[in-house]
A protein has these predicted regions:
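Surface-exposed, flexible loop/turn segments at secondary-structure boundaries
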Residues: 82-84, 137, 147
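Short, intrinsically disordered, charge-balanced linker/junction segments flanking boundaries
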Residues: 149-152
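N-terminal subdomain of lithium-sensitive/metallo-dependent phosphomonoesterases centered on the IMPase/IPPase/PAP
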Residues: 1-98
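DPxDG-like acidic metal-binding loop motif
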Residues: 90-145
Length: 152
C-alpha cells in the first residue's frame, strides 16, 4: 500500500501552535473521530503484507493519522510506520507519537478494547495526550500541569 510518509516541508504545511493544548486536543479529537469512522466501516481484516501481525486496517488508519498530523505541521513517530516528518528532522522540537490502532487483534474479534493513542512531545517532554476507545467512544486526555480527564 502506498503511504504518505513524505510530509510537506514546515514552510508549506499549515501549523497548529503546539503550545495551545486546546488546539492540539481539538486536532487529536478530529483524528480519533476519523479513525473511529474508518474502523466502523472496515470489513477487511486481511494482513497488510508489510509486517507480521499488521492488518490492512492498521495501514488505512495510520495513513489517516499521518495525513492529519502532517497537515498540521507535525513530525510523527508511528507504531505502524515509524518516523515521518518535515525536512527529515529526527530531532524536532515537537513530535507526535501515535499508535493508530492499539489492540487491532481485539478489533478483529469484535472486542471493545481498541484505541487510537496520541501524545505530543515538546522538547522531549510529553505535554498533551489523548487515548480514544474506538468502540465505546470513551476518551481520556491529559495536559502537562492540567491533570487528566475522562470525556472532558
Amino acid at each position: 500500500m502506498d503511504r504518505p510518509n513524505d510530509a510537506p516541508t514546515s514552510a508549506d504545511a499549515p501549523t497548529i501552535d503546539a503550545s495551545d493544548s486546546h488546539a492540539v486536543l481539538t486536532l487529536f479529537g478530529a483524528i480519533c473521530d476519523r479513525t473511529t469512522t474508518i474502523l466502523a466501516a472496515n470489513d477487511d481484516w486481511s494482513a497488510s503484507g508489510e509486517r507480521d501481525g499488521q492488518y490492512s486496517v492498521d495501514v488505512e488508519i495510520d495513513t489517516a493519522c499521518l495525513d492529519m498530523l502532517h497537515g498540521a505541521g507535525f513530525a510523527v513517530l508511528s507504531e505502524e510506520s515509524g518516523w515521518s516528518g518535515p525536512n527529515d528532522d529526527h530531532s524536532p522540537t515537537h513530535l507526535v507519537v501515535v499508535d493508530p490502532l492499539d489492540g487491532s487483534t481485539n478489533a478483529t474479534l469484535g472486542l471493545p478494547w481498541c484505541a487510537t493513542a496520541l501524545c505530543l512531545v515538546s522538547n522531549g517532554v510529553p505535554t498533551v495526550a489523548m487515548v480514544a476507545n474506538l468502540r465505546t467512544g470513551t476518551r481520556y486526555t491529559a495536559v502537562l500541569g492540567g491533570g487528566a480527564r475522562r470525556n472532558g
